Amino acid sequence: MSKAPFLSRAAFARVTNPLARGLLRIGLTPDAVTIIGTTASVAGALVLFPMGKLFPGACVVWFFVLFDMLDGAMARERGGGTRFGAVLDAACDRISDGAVFGGLLWWVAFGMRDRLLVVATLICLVTSQVISYIKARAEASGLRGDGGIIERPERLIIVLAGAGVSDFPFIAWPPALPVAMWLLAVTSVITCGQRLYTVWTSPGATDLLVPSAPVRDDDAQGHPRSGDPGKTQR
């Protein structure tokens, strides 16, 4: 979650907690909310953005991104989330981000036909996945890999604001999309570097890994090794 005051957990909690309790009362689970929010945001991004309907697309995606944030509040209201729920939420976030940049990439390439902007959008698409992967892989290795100037909330604000303003009814400002995409492309590359540096400077990051012993096929299948009559299949 962003450290900006208007994106703080306390600010969101004042709005999301009552909504979370209401959704739990009608029988929805946090995982169901995650799937619903992701499906709707992906549909909005992949249907509206390629058609050049950037303002409606940004509104739809933003609404369901906020809706998807309720899953965490729901999990806390019922006493905690599950490990599967955490993995599902992270996976759905990556799918949603990919759909947003993929839909915009289609419009930029085939609607606007702006080759330079295609480059910026591709950078945003790739780095949005890499930034998250660095953190996940680092934490799986017991290292730190968080931080950076651009995290997911800021990334969504920049790209959706740029898309929406560029197609805003009556007072559209078309340069808003290129400005947003290039800003995001540059800051995302910087964030990748920052996270890699954080991993590199984590305690134990440069220690040599101890290679694991190779496992023979017959061992993996539970068959006894030849010459080991005392070992039985398990």
Swiss-Prot record:
<comment type="function">
    <text>Catalyzes the conjugation of the 1'-hydroxyl group of D-myo-inositol-3-phosphate (also named L-myo-inositol-1-phosphate) with a lipid tail of cytidine diphosphate diacylglycerol (CDP-DAG), forming phosphatidylinositol phosphate (PIP) and CMP. PIP is a precursor of phosphatidylinositol (PI) which is an essential lipid for mycobacteria required for formation of their cell wall.</text>
</comment>
<keyword id="KW-1133">Transmembrane helix</keyword>
<dbReference type="GO" id="GO:0016780">
    <property type="term" value="F:phosphotransferase activity, for other substituted phosphate groups"/>
</dbReference>
<feature type="compositionally biased region" description="Basic and acidic residues">
    <location>
        <begin position="215"/>
        <end position="228"/>
    </location>
</feature>
<feature type="transmembrane region" description="Helical">
    <location>
        <begin position="155"/>
        <end position="173"/>
    </location>
</feature>
<keyword id="KW-0812">Transmembrane</keyword>
<comment type="pathway">
    <text>Phospholipid metabolism; phosphatidylinositol phosphate biosynthesis.</text>
</comment>
<feature type="binding site">
    <location>
        <position position="89"/>
    </location>
    <ligand>
        <name>Mg(2+) 1</name>
    </ligand>
</feature>
<dbReference type="InterPro" id="IPR000462">
    <property type="entry name" value="CDP-OH_P_trans"/>
</dbReference>
<dbReference type="InterPro" id="IPR048254">
    <property type="entry name" value="CDP_ALCOHOL_P_TRANSF_CS"/>
</dbReference>
<feature type="transmembrane region" description="Helical">
    <location>
        <begin position="179"/>
        <end position="197"/>
    </location>
</feature>
<feature type="binding site">
    <location>
        <position position="82"/>
    </location>
    <ligand>
        <name>a CDP-1,2-diacyl-sn-glycerol</name>
    </ligand>
</feature>
<feature type="binding site">
    <location>
        <position position="68"/>
    </location>
    <ligand>
        <name>Mg(2+) 2</name>
    </ligand>
</feature>
<dbReference type="GO" id="GO:0005886">
    <property type="term" value="C:plasma membrane"/>
</dbReference>
<feature type="transmembrane region" description="Helical">
    <location>
        <begin position="116"/>
        <end position="134"/>
    </location>
</feature>
<comment type="similarity">
    <text>Belongs to the CDP-alcohol phosphatidyltransferase class-I family.</text>
</comment>
<keyword id="KW-0460">Magnesium</keyword>
<feature type="transmembrane region" description="Helical">
    <location>
        <begin position="91"/>
        <end position="110"/>
    </location>
</feature>
<protein>
    <recommendedName>
        <fullName>Phosphatidylinositol phosphate synthase</fullName>
        <ecNumber>2.7.8.-</ecNumber>
    </recommendedName>
</protein>
<feature type="binding site">
    <location>
        <position position="68"/>
    </location>
    <ligand>
        <name>Mg(2+) 1</name>
    </ligand>
</feature>
<dbReference type="GO" id="GO:0008654">
    <property type="term" value="P:phospholipid biosynthetic process"/>
</dbReference>
<keyword id="KW-0808">Transferase</keyword>
<keyword id="KW-0472">Membrane</keyword>
<keyword id="KW-1003">Cell membrane</keyword>
<dbReference type="InterPro" id="IPR043130">
    <property type="entry name" value="CDP-OH_PTrfase_TM_dom"/>
</dbReference>
<dbReference type="GO" id="GO:0000287">
    <property type="term" value="F:magnesium ion binding"/>
</dbReference>
<feature type="region of interest" description="Disordered">
    <location>
        <begin position="211"/>
        <end position="234"/>
    </location>
</feature>
<comment type="subunit">
    <text>Homodimer.</text>
</comment>
<feature type="binding site">
    <location>
        <position position="71"/>
    </location>
    <ligand>
        <name>Mg(2+) 1</name>
    </ligand>
</feature>
<keyword id="KW-0479">Metal-binding</keyword>
<dbReference type="Pfam" id="PF01066">
    <property type="entry name" value="CDP-OH_P_transf"/>
</dbReference>
<dbReference type="InterPro" id="IPR044268">
    <property type="entry name" value="PIP_synthase_PgsA1"/>
</dbReference>
<feature type="transmembrane region" description="Helical">
    <location>
        <begin position="54"/>
        <end position="70"/>
    </location>
</feature>
<feature type="binding site">
    <location>
        <position position="76"/>
    </location>
    <ligand>
        <name>a CDP-1,2-diacyl-sn-glycerol</name>
    </ligand>
</feature>
<feature type="active site" description="Proton acceptor">
    <location>
        <position position="93"/>
    </location>
</feature>
<feature type="binding site">
    <location>
        <begin position="31"/>
        <end position="34"/>
    </location>
    <ligand>
        <name>a CDP-1,2-diacyl-sn-glycerol</name>
    </ligand>
</feature>
<feature type="transmembrane region" description="Helical">
    <location>
        <begin position="28"/>
        <end position="48"/>
    </location>
</feature>
<feature type="binding site">
    <location>
        <position position="89"/>
    </location>
    <ligand>
        <name>Mg(2+) 2</name>
    </ligand>
</feature>
<feature type="binding site">
    <location>
        <position position="72"/>
    </location>
    <ligand>
        <name>a CDP-1,2-diacyl-sn-glycerol</name>
    </ligand>
</feature>
<feature type="binding site">
    <location>
        <position position="93"/>
    </location>
    <ligand>
        <name>Mg(2+) 2</name>
    </ligand>
</feature>
